[in-house]
Amino acid sequence: DMKDYIVKSLDRIEWVANDILEQKELLDFDEFARRYEANVRAMIKEKDLIALKSIIAYTTGLEVKVLPEKEVREGYYRYLCDRTSRADEKIIRDYCFCKACEICQELDIPMQVHTAFGDSPLCDLGKCNPLNMYEVINAYKDTKLILIHAGYPFCEELGFLMNHYENVYG
């Protein structure tokens, strides 16, 4: 009997970015950034989310870089010209992940991150090691990062991160 339980949701940030990038209208970077942040915030509010979720491990990998805006802006425009560029897609996905971490920090909700081996055909196991998140973990020390699937097969690495960083959970 579930009547005594409250069920809450979380949702993927990648869907928000994908919806914007797949529109026929080409946006300048400032408008993309504005819409992404506004849409993530709206998703949290409308769905009463208790966390955000990312599958970045399965798209461009866990080595998320905190990049200067100039570099993100340039990568965004290159990506609009060549949507097959994995390097420029990574720049955009890293930017979106970092922006979501900022929102999570501000709203005091966690970011749930898929780690370990996934089911996507784009998944590169070497890019799924939780230790690859070193830069972003340090950059967003006030964002709670829940690294799920025990980092398998990198369980020891996930344990190391949980032991050394107060903002990392598994």
Enumerate the predicted regions with their spans.
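Active-site gating/metal-coordination segments in enzymes
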Residues: 1-110
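Catalytic pocket-lining loop regions of alpha/beta-barrel enzymes
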Residues: 61, 75-170
